[in-house]
Design a protein with these regions (language model features):
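Beta/alpha (TIM)-barrel catalytic core signal, keyed to glycine-rich beta->alpha loops juxtaposed to Asp/Glu
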Residues: 89, 93-183
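Acidic (Asp/Glu)-rich catalytic clusters
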Residues: 14, 36-49, 70-77, 102-106, ...
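Short, acidic/polar
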Residues: 1-12, 60-76, 97-100, 124-129
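Conserved, mostly hydrophobic/aromatic
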Residues: 5, 20, 35, 50, ...
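N-terminal binding-site loop/beta-alpha segment at the start of enzyme catalytic domains
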Residues: 1-48, 107
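Active-site mouth loops of central-metabolism enzymes
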Residues: 1-3, 53-64, 87-93, 156
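Short catalytic-loop micro-motif centered on adjacent basic/acidic residues
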Residues: 19-26, 85-86, 112-117
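A short, structured active-site edge motif that brings together acidic residues
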Residues: 46-57, 84, 141-146
Length: 183
């Protein structure tokens, strides 16, 4: 409910939290809506960072990214996402198609930093290599599972964790890691 969401957001913000992670699919869009209402009611758009995600399975294709971002922005009542991550990967789609779509959306001013959530290291690094080669916008953010407990089996289909090789890459390439973990 809105009351429950506002209470959680107020407690998080009051404890110093300034980064809010949301996604197009969370609670059928109500996650975005409640967060947007809270941001607007507290006039905090310039005080916080919003991480948004879209293109979750089965709509994990480039043509779904922009419309889902626009719908999320409307729900959130903000003009742009500070950070945007593709929510899942679709290995049947060339990384170039994702990077090209995200570069266009960034050039429109709808997102600042781009990244990926639940992408394997080979695809993530391939996407960055393509972006640098073609002078496109590279992934600068990763939001994979990472915690003190190693994920043996994915919590949900398509989830990817950060292993030692991935961590070496993240550190070497100076990727911002916004991990998630089941609770």
């Amino acid at each position: 409910s809105e009351v429950h969401a506002f209470t959680m957001f107020d407690n998080f913000y009051g404890s110093g939290g300034r980064i809010f992670d949301t996604a197009y699919i969370y609670n059928n869009g109500m996650g975005d809506k409640y967060l947007g209402q809270w941001i607007n009611s507290r006039q905090l758009e310039k005080e916080i960072i919003v991480i948004g995600k879209a293109a979750h399975t089965p709509q994990c294709e480039p043509q779904f990214i922009r419309p889902q971002i626009l719908e999320s922005l409307e729900r959130l009542q903000i003009k742009k996402l500070d950070i945007f991550c593709l929510h899942r990967d679709n290995s049947e789609v060339p990384v170039a198609e994702f990077i090209d779509a995200l570069t266009e959306i960034k050039e429109e001013g709808l997102i600042d930093l781009i990244g990926a959530s639940n992408w394997e290291l080979d695809r993530f690094s391939e996407a960055r290599a393509y972006a640098f080669k073609e002078k496109k916008e590279p992934f600068k953010v990763l939001s994979n599972n990472f915690s003190l407990a190693e994920m043996i089996e994915p919590v949900w289909p398509g989830c990817v964790g950060v292993n030692d090789a991935y961590m070496e890459y993240i550190l070497k390439e100076e990727i911002l890691l916004f991990p998630w973990s089941s609770q």
